[in-house]
């Protein structure tokens, strides 16, 4: 509760009380889907957890949602209803290779935000935006079930042939099915999961899809990350009917996340100094740095494994990383 309250009280977040554009004093607002989508979700949580702040929090969430809607591609466009990955020229948004581009799966973050706001307010506007995003994903999916990792924000043309890791979209479709009874998008999950298992997992090429790291010229295995491996393991372990193949794939992905990115301890250097505080989880090959979100990814995967298998070691590892 204190974490969401802390975020709520940040000056750049408080700015949403009176405006419908982001306060760029917090320069990560340059990533609308990811950060402003998360802001909306945070404020809905604040409204639920702190009733005295509910009116203020929902006003902030609605203003942030207005910004995402205003920035979204229009109906009929190749990326209809998608808000952008990048805004203005802060941080990585200023890079030439990001100008006018968008990460294909980041609209899922905005979709979840719209659904959270709809759930709280009942305002059909937000539900319709979330469904519009899902409809666009239905149109964009390739015959083999895959999606390009990054595309032109106006034309929808891929920047290259690197494919996206699909756990964000699979979880989005799962929410639409389970919470709202929508089966229209089940084919996205069926085809997408098949591609993930037969291509990405089979090749063990769980590539990173970070908005601040270029995918131009990206070779297989060049930028592996727990941020795709561990969440997809969790997706498999949370299926209603888990097959033996699902379980084995999940275990392998967790092993990848532990072996390549998790430090249970650090050998001190000649001066007795440890490079990192351990245990920790580094994010990706191209950003070899401990990140809390990565620790969360791997911890949740271990916890999901424990809940399926009862393995006490998996539970111990999950607890250690938190």
Descriptions of predicted regions:
Residues 1-322:
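Glycan-recognition and catalytic cores of secretory/periplasmic carbohydrate-active enzymes
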């Amino acid at each position: 509760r204190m974490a969401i309250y802390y975020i709520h009280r940040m000056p750049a977040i408080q700015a949403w009380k009176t405006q419908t554009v982001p306060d760029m004093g917090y320069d990560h607002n340059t990533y609308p889907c990811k950060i402003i989508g998360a802001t909306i979700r945070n404020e809905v949580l604040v409204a639920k957890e702190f009733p005295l702040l509910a009116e203020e929090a929902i006003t902030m969430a609605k203003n942030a949602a207005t910004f995402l809607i205003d920035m979204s591609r229009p109906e009929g466009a190749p990326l209809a209803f998608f808000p952008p990955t990048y805004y203005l020229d802060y941080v990585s948004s200023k890079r030439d290779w990001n100008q006018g581009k968008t990460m294909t799966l980041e609209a899922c973050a905005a979709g979840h935000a719209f659904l959270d706001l709809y759930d709280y307010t009942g305002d059909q506007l937000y539900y319709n935006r979330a469904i519009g995003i899902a409809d666009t994903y239905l149109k964009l999916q390739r015959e083999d079930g895959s999606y390009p990792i990054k595309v032109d924000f106006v034309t929808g043309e891929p920047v290259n042939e690197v494919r996206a890791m699909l756990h964000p979209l699979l979880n989005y479709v799962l929410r639409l099915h389970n919470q709202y009874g929508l089966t229209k998008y089940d084919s996205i999950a069926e085809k997408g999961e098949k591609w993930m298992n037969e291509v990405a997992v089979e090749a063990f090429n769980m590539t990173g899809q970070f908005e601040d790291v270029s995918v131009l010229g990206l070779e297989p295995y060049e930028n592996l990350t727990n941020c795709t491996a561990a969440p997809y393991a969790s997706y498999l372990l949370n299926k209603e009917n888990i097959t033996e193949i699902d379980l084995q794939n999940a275990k392998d992905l967790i092993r990848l996340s532990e072996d390549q990115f998790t430090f249970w301890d650090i050998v001190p250097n000649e001066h007795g100094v440890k490079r990192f505080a351990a245990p920790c989880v580094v994010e990706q090959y191209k950003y070899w740095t401990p990140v809390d979100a990565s620790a969360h990814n791997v911890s949740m995967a271990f916890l999901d494994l424990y809940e399926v298998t009862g393995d006490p070691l998996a539970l111990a590892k999950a607890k250690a990383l938190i």
